[in-house]
Amino acid sequence: MAAMTGLFWQSQAEDRPQWGGFHTRNMVSTETGLPTGFDLETGKNVKWSASLGGNAYGSPVIASGKVLIGANNESPRDPRNTADCAVLLCLDESDGSLIWQLAVPRIGGDDYLDWPLIGMCSAPTVEGRRAYLLTNRFEVVCLDLDGQSNGNDGPFMEEGAHMVPSDEAPLDVTATDGDIIWLTDLRSAVDMYPHDGAHASILIDGPYLYLNSGNGVDNTHKVIRKPEAPSLIVLDKETGKVVAQDGELIGPRIFHATWAPPAMGEVDGRKLVVFGGPDGVCYAFDALSSATAADPIQTLTRVWRFDCDPTAPKENVSSFLKNRKEGPSIIESMPVFVNGRVYVTVGGDIWWGKKQSWLKCIDAAKTGEITASGEIWSYPMETHCVATPAVSNGLVFITDCEGFVHCIDADTGEAYWTHEAGGEFWGSTLVADGKVYAGSRNKDFCILRASKDKELLGTVTFPAPIASTPVAANGRLYINTLETLYALEESSGK
């Protein structure tokens, strides 16, 4: 089964059906012929654009002629449903027109459970005719990639009730609504506690779905309501049943929430799942080889543990709330698994923590407690960092929250150059076609040469802030601001 899954991904090499590279999470694409410049006013190199409403923090995925991306319901696409919903849009890759949407209303009762007005933050993962997503209500859903166009497939048949608040009457399901195959509510399935916004990118390995649980603090930002909830979980792909979870008891050490999706790779013939914990520790577990929906929930076997900030406090971490000088570290980005090494960013929480972070390079072949032995190098940044690295041709590219793009030697951690873009980065870099692409929250999008010799190729100012990661697929570059998705293609438009 795993081999078949790998072949499927290889056969769709031009698509981008997962956020980041397959399993590795590396923000690198093999696409060529991508635009170096574009003009949003004249339409030069702009194939199409699509409105996302507002607060669209997620990044797109592209598969089987469709583009899937998170949006909100600020400008309702279905006039029957005007509630505050997070929305997953399925657009036609050729022209950006709407095929279907999955609208999910807020949890309600406490804004900190499901922050109002933000878009669907999680990027789906597509395999075959199925898409897997963590919704804003912390539900893992399996979706029919064709929506309702081929009928309402079960076993889940309550889409009409699911798309509206619980105190409203169900809507009739139409051809432009999403089709949920199955749904697993993590609040009941693993007894976790939601915080702010659900953020995950599901990793598929054969019959298994790996994702971070989302467990976090309550609205006081000082109490962990569910300290025993797992941080990393595994679901059966066919049924949605939880089949495994970590046993690290990370809960009491959570400073904010569990937002970092896992990565996967092999070293010395051993397949590892690598997870950046909300406690600032990077963990590696053996990948599951035998677990079914009928079995009791397994505990993942830890292979190694690397504390990215060993001198930081590990107990009573809430006492450091709003302390910008000292406190615990948290991992808020995906680890990248390349050539037997793990590259991961770690540091103070962007909202409440110390203004300090690092890019770590870890030897993935180690075992046990490897905090002292596993570090290959460490690159300090005197600010926050929530970005996932891009590792390409011996170089690592990373953005930070002070508005810098960094180019670093992948073997030694030596800095080659930095580029100041002028506004903070929440998204990651994309390396493709010999270029480094990155968009900032001050609306500027920069294009640099992917080289140890710094060369700025261009800067384009967008109409709205960018908090996502650019994506390349099928000869196009996709960039979304908080309001609009742009499909860019060389020689398109005027």
Model-derived segments and spans:
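Noncatalytic, solvent-exposed loop/strand surfaces
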Residues: 8-494
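Bacterial N-terminal signal peptides
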Residues: 1-6
